[in-house]
Amino acid sequence: MEDELALSDQGSDEDEEVLTPAELINKLEEAWLNEKFAPELLESKSEVVECVMEQLNHMEQNLHRAKPGDLKISFHHMEIERIRYMLSSYLRSRMLKIEKFFPHILEKEKSRGEGEPPHLSPEEFAFAKEYMTNTETLLKSVALRHMPPNLQTVDLLKSVPKPNLDSFVFLRVKEEQNNILVEPETDEQSEYAIDMEVGSQHLIRYRTIAPLVASGAVKLI
């Protein structure tokens, strides 16, 4: 794992970021934990996924060239399995959220402004659209066609629950943050501000720090 890998920003060669394999795996781990603990679907990290898959292929090729009986082979096998687990868990977490919140995710992607990063990879977008079509077809064939005419339509945006952005999450601060406004827990309390030092850990409502997760200033744990 000595080579460096290029990770571009939204496909622009000018914004290419060169990472060591260790830095790439750290990015995958952070993306995995953020996705695992965030209540909503986060920005797609498809380029990280592609680079990690490329790195896994490179590591496996190195294993085939290694001498039989070399103790390092066992450690490399363990590292490959660890990376595979993080990668598959990351993709599985995203797929489960797409299945659970698909109408809201598609609506958000549809209304995404120009220049905003996509929350779905092309493959995920195709899956979400197909999942929505299949859900509508199933509802019509199994239930809606047996209903009175005025009840034969369903608004999936209203029927499918939204992600609970008010759920609480644990986080670790990567970049110092000042005057973060925290919403009150009860009507008797008032809004207040907190400062978060680098390395500090907090339990806080996700909605409050969602922009900080997106920017990479904090990471979920």
From Swiss-Prot:
InterPro entries noted in UniProt: GINS_A (IPR021151), GINS_bundle-like_dom_sf (IPR036224), GINS_Sld5 (IPR008591), SLD5_C (IPR031633), Sld5_GINS_A (IPR038749)
Instruction: Provide the alphabetized UniProt keywords.
Output: Chromosome, Cytoplasm, DNA replication, Nucleus
The answer to whether the entry has keyword Nucleus is yes
According to UniProt, the name of this protein is DNA replication complex GINS protein SLD5
In the record, biological process GO terms are:
DNA replication; DNA-templated DNA replication; double-strand break repair via break-induced replication
Task: Give one GO term, molecular function aspect.
Answer: chromatin binding
Q: What does this protein do?
A: Required for initiation of chromosomal DNA replication. Core component of CDC45-MCM-GINS (CMG) helicase, the molecular machine that unwinds template DNA during replication, and around which the replisome is built.
Per UniProt, subcellular location reads as: Nucleus; Chromosome; Cytoplasm
Q: Which domain of life is it from?
A: Eukaryota
GO cellular component terms?
Answer: CMG complex; cytoplasm; GINS complex; nucleus
Organism for this UniProt entry: Xenopus laevis (African clawed frog)
Q: Can you tell me which family this protein belongs to?
A: Belongs to the GINS4/SLD5 family.
Quaternary structure and interacting proteins, as annotated = Component of the GINS complex which is a heterotetramer of gins1/psf1, gins2/psf2, gins3/psf3 and gins4/sld5. Component of the CMG helicase complex, composed of the mcm2-7 complex, the GINS complex and cdc45.
